[in-house]
């Protein structure tokens, strides 16, 4: 008998096992929306390393579950050290102010 983890448990596990997690549409190599592409570019510009990505288009339960988990309605979503940072617009603002680089120890 296989025990299924519920979606929120899967998300908690992904966030706890990776220092940086980006929930996005598509992959870093082939983003499927402009906001996800922008998020990847911002992380690259910050010098973020070992970024785990989750393609929400591959799993409907994760796509809806991450929105419920964060209480944030849009994708992409960035988590750093277990904390929800925000989406592409917030990432851009934080990058421009230098705050995002500090999260990665790159300031």
Give the role of each language-model region.
Residues 1-4:
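Short, Lys/Arg-enriched N-terminal segments with co-localized hydrophobic residues
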Residues 7-9:
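Eukaryotic intrinsically disordered and solvent-exposed regulatory patches
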Residues 13-50:
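Local sequence-structure signature of Cys/Sec-based thiol-disulfide redox active-site neighborhoods
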């Amino acid at each position: 008998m296989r025990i299924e983890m519920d979606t929120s448990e899967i998300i908690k596990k992904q966030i706890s096992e990776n220092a940086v997690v980006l929930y996005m549409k598509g992959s870093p190599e082939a983003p499927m929306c402009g906001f996800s592409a922008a998020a990847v570019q911002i992380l690259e510009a910050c010098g973020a390393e070992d970024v785990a990505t989750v393609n929400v288009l591959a799993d409907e339960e994760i796509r809806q579950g991450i929105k419920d988990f964060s209480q944030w309605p849009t994708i992409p979503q960035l988590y750093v050290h277990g904390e929800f940072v925000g989406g592409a617009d917030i990432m851009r603002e934080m990058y421009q102010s230098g705050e995002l680089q500090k999260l990665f120890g790159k300031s």
